[in-house]
Amino acid sequence: MADLMFIISRIENMMYEVTFDPAKRKGKIIVNISIVNESDLKKIIGLFRQAVHSGLAVSPFMKIIRAGEKIGNVKIEAKKAGIASACSITIDGVLLKAGIPVKPKLGGVVEIHEGSPLRFTDVLTYDSTTIDPLDVFMSQELTSVTHMINTGSGKILANMRESPMSARNKIELVLDSLVNAGFSCILEVGEPNNDILGVQVGRDKMGIAVIGGTNPMALVQENDIEIDTRELSILLDIEEMVHIDELKI
């Protein structure tokens, strides 16, 4: 019998392979691959665009993979299409590349009220599960991304990581550079030794909450459109991706 591999092991391996440089806007990021019916592609990209423009995606950069093409070890079947989109663990990889120790802790559902994040309502730690927590919560239909976009209040997917509080200034510089590069997915940066969105952090640590990369997929699911997402799929050079507003469908 094969040993179980908790999702944290895969996350840490992929973090180490991230080469993205926000200042140069070059390098490899971690992407999720979504498989959809080709006939739904135009509508799905429209929904993804809504999520991006509402600040509910990791990055506006995407790539469409056509039927018959292959990305990583995923081959797109006839009458299907693939969409590669940024995974939030890319943020951890960029922090790590900058020499900042970072430990992804958990994924969950965050309650938003009038545009402000209140608290995590449901969480799963990365070292306690063999599958991505955000996939679990999306499959249980616990999100209300549509309501969030329409009203400013709702429940979205997010995750949290810890870093040493002594690295705070450097963390803020790196996060600012990511925002300038289009990765405007930082939900909240906590104070040292203080809870973040109701979740306790370790001693001499600070928490960083980031919007989950699967919120656009949750929006599609809420609209009763079939979508099969494979989180933490591969690393992809960002220069192979284009802004969602420039995608040719």
Task: Mark where each language-model region is.
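Conserved mixed alpha/beta catalytic, RNA-binding, or beta-rich assembly cores of soluble enzyme
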Residues: 1-13, 22-249
